[in-house]
């Protein structure tokens, strides 16, 4: 079903700018057409995010309520006990999640913390869930240790374009982020990497971010596209909200540039109406965080997400290795039927 020739790592700025400049309907049509060549258009991956260590981060990311530099009313919490994390993971699985993501507000994990986080990874994997972590910058040895524990994904976002980055963060360089991503790849883990929209950047910065992601030697397997949640006490608390159509355009371009990646509709969904989320799915978003909280910010209630899925005819994506033989047969039959349908549409238009 997929077309490998569509997967490229040599995009030019001019090409990406041309995609952003397409009429809205044309852009979404192209994104949806490509999406259907690589994914079931009516399935969305469901992940759950758990904050395993909250607050007191020494970094100065202008959007983040967990920075120790800002007075956001967030209380510092110690690293969560392994048993508690695994309880959260079990609850996530029982609610339908297939991936469990764990986030810690660190610049980078300390040596004394590694036995605890690797124990969390092993416990999550034993439940049959995919495991993802975001712990800040990690070196080669830490990446190897996490990989050996069974970690599937490591999240480390680029946040924005190289040009706008210095306006948002000064305590960690863009190259620091790229180095961590290289360490993750070298250890054999999958990469989760995206950015945040609506931080005051312009379209050229959204072009620049997606260009960085799409021209990596291997595309991130997961690309979270976040909408800024302007938290009181952070430098961006008064930031004007991004036009939803600009947000949808970014998702659509991400889908076209990285056709094999899961594009995650991530932070900011609490402030999106159902119509905006439906457009995001049509533009190629096929992953969400499920649960009432994302680290420290609100997220739509779980039953609200399932109600929206039902209205749109969307089903939660299942992990391939956990599909039954009958489900695999049904999937193959569906793909054959879709291929035949595509051929009919093609002939009708010719």
Curated annotation (Swiss-Prot):
GO molecular function: 2 iron, 2 sulfur cluster binding; 4 iron, 4 sulfur cluster binding; biotin synthase activity; iron ion binding
EC number assigned by the record: 2.8.1.6
Reactions listed under catalytic activity: (4R,5S)-dethiobiotin + (sulfur carrier)-SH + 2 reduced [2Fe-2S]-[ferredoxin] + 2 S-adenosyl-L-methionine = (sulfur carrier)-H + biotin + 2 5'-deoxyadenosine + 2 L-methionine + 2 oxidized [2Fe-2S]-[ferredoxin]
Essential cofactor(s): [4Fe-4S] cluster; [2Fe-2S] cluster
Keyword match Membrane: no
Cofactor, free-text remark: Binds 1 [4Fe-4S] cluster. The cluster is coordinated with 3 cysteines and an exchangeable S-adenosyl-L-methionine. Binds 1 [2Fe-2S] cluster. The cluster is coordinated with 3 cysteines and 1 arginine.
Pathway this chain belongs to: Cofactor biosynthesis; biotin biosynthesis; biotin from 7,8-diaminononanoate: step 2/2
Domain Radical SAM core as annotated: residue spans: 42-269
InterPro entries per UniProt: Aldolase_TIM (IPR013785), BATS_dom (IPR010722), Biotin_synth/BioAB (IPR002684), Biotin_synthase (IPR024177), Elp3/MiaA/NifB-like_rSAM (IPR006638), rSAM (IPR007197)
Residues engaged in binding [4Fe-4S] cluster: 57, 61, 64
Binding site for [2Fe-2S] cluster: 101, 132, 192, 264
UniProt keyword annotations, A-Z: 2Fe-2S, 4Fe-4S, Biotin biosynthesis, Iron, Iron-sulfur, Metal-binding, S-adenosyl-L-methionine, Transferase
Gene Ontology annotations of biological process type: biotin biosynthetic process
Family: Belongs to the radical SAM superfamily. Biotin synthase family.
Summary of the function given for this chain in its UniProt record: Catalyzes the conversion of dethiobiotin (DTB) to biotin by the insertion of a sulfur atom into dethiobiotin via a radical-based mechanism.
Quaternary structure and interacting proteins, as annotated: Homodimer.
The protein, known as: Biotin synthase
């Amino acid at each position: 079903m997929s077309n490998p020739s569509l997967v490229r790592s040599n995009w030019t700025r001019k090409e990406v700018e041309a995609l952003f400049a397409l009429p809205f309907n044309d852009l979404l049509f192209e994104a949806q057409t490509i999406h259907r060549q690589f994914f079931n258009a009516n399935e969305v991956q469901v992940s759950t995010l758990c904050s395993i260590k909250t607050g007191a981060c020494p970094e100065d990311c202008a959007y983040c309520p967990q920075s120790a530099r800002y007075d956001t009313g967030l209380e510092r919490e110690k690293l969560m006990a392994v048993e508690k994390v695994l309880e959260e993971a079990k609850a996530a699985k029982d609610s339908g999640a297939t991936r469990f993501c764990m986030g810690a507000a660190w610049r980078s994990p300390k040596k004394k913390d590694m036995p605890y986080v690797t124990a969390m990874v092993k416990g999550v994997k034993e439940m049959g869930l995919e495991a993802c972590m975001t712990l800040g910058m990690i070196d080669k040895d830490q990446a190897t240790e996490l990989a050996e524990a069974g970690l599937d994904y490591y999240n480390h976002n680029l946040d924005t374009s190289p040009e706008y980055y210095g306006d948002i963060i000064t305590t960690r360089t863009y190259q620091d982020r790229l180095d961590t991503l290289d360490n993750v790849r070298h250890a054999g883990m999958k990469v989760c990497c995206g950015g945040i929209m609506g931080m005051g950047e312009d379209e050229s910065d959204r072009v620049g971010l997606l260009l960085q992601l799409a021209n990596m030697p291997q595309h991130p397997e997961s690309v979270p596209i976040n909408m800024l949640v302007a938290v009181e006490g952070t430098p961006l608390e008064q930031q004007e909200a991004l036009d939803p159509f600009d947000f949808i355009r970014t998702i659509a371009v991400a889908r076209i540039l990285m056709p094999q990646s899961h594009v995650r509709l991530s932070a900011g969904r609490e402030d999106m109406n159902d119509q905006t989320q439906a457009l995001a799915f049509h533009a190629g978003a096929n992953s969400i965080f499920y649960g009432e909280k994302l680290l420290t910010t609100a997220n739509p209630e779980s039953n609200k997400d399932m109600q929206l899925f039902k209205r749109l005819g969307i089903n939660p994506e299942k992990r391939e290795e956990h599909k039954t033989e009958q489900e695999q047969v049904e999937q193959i039959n569906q793909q054959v039927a879709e291929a035949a349908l595509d051929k009919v549409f093609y002939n009708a238009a010719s």
